[in-house]
């Protein structure tokens, strides 16, 4: 699968990030994060930029340890994509997922903070 990826320079909360991507005919990045080639490219870019970025995964459905990518696929808590000791508080208020600049891996955080955004669009072959 090929993807078009958009990295925003604007910061916004998680809900606004989803709207931002949708207004461009895209979605918060999710399926590209499960593609080994794409995830390497995305993480290489975010590492150079040194900012936190929203991705399309959250725990808003039930507040348990059940993170899902926005396309409905499970994001296991033992995934290699998580930063060390993360997710750390998904049963409380840390229900959304970012790429955390400290480790350049995923981190569960509150949904109201301002972060940059990564959008994706799957391209037809």
UniProtKB/Swiss-Prot annotation:
Domain C-type lectin, first and last residues per copy: 1-120
Gene Ontology terms, MF aspect: carbohydrate binding
InterPro entries reported for this sequence: C-type_lectin-like, C-type_lectin-like/link_sf, C-type_lectin_CS, Ca-Dep_Lectins_ImmuneDev, CTDL_fold, TC14-like_CTLD
Alphabetized SUPFAM superfamilies for the sequence: C-type lectin-like
Disulfide bonds: 21-119, 96-111
Transmembrane segments: none
Regions annotated as coiled coil: none
Keyword vocabulary terms for this entry: Calcium, Disulfide bond, Lectin
Subunit details: Homodimer.
Role played: Role in the defense system of the organism against microorganisms. This calcium-binding lectin binds galactose.
Protein name: Lectin
Organism: Polyandrocarpa misakiensis
